[in-house]
Amino acid sequence: MKLTCVMIVAVLFLTAWTVVTAEPHSSNVLENLYLKAHHEMENPEASKLNTRDRCQRANFVCDAFHHAAVCCEGVCVLVCAW
C-alpha cells in the first residue's frame, strides 16, 4: 500500500515537472522546422540530407572520428567495405 502511494506520488511529480519544464512555444518550434524543410525543398543544395555526393568509395580509409567520411555502400570498418 505504501509502495503504491509512493509510486503514484512519484509519477505525479514527474508529470508536473515535465509540464513545468516544457518549452512554452512548442508550436513555433514545429513552424520553424516546417519553414526550414520548405526552404530546403526550394534550394536542394541547402539540404543536409543530401550526402550522397560526399560519400566515399570502397577501400577508402575511414574511422569513427570523421563523420563526413560516409561510405557510399557497405559499412566503415577502418576502410569502406561491402
From Swiss-Prot:
GO CC annotations, alphabetized: extracellular region
GO molecular function: ion channel inhibitor activity; toxin activity
Propeptide position ranges: 23-53
Domains (record comment): The presence of a 'disulfide through disulfide knot' structurally defines this protein as a knottin. The cysteine framework is VI/VII (C-C-CC-C-C).
Expression tissues: Expressed by the venom duct.
Stated name of the protein: Conotoxin C11GB
Protein's cellular compartments: Secreted
Disulphide connectivity of cysteines: 55-72, 62-76, 71-80
Family from the record: Belongs to the conotoxin O1 superfamily.
Keywords: Disulfide bond, Knottin, Neurotoxin, Secreted, Signal, Toxin
Transmembrane segments: none
Signal sequence range: 1-22
InterPro entries according to UniProt: Conotoxin
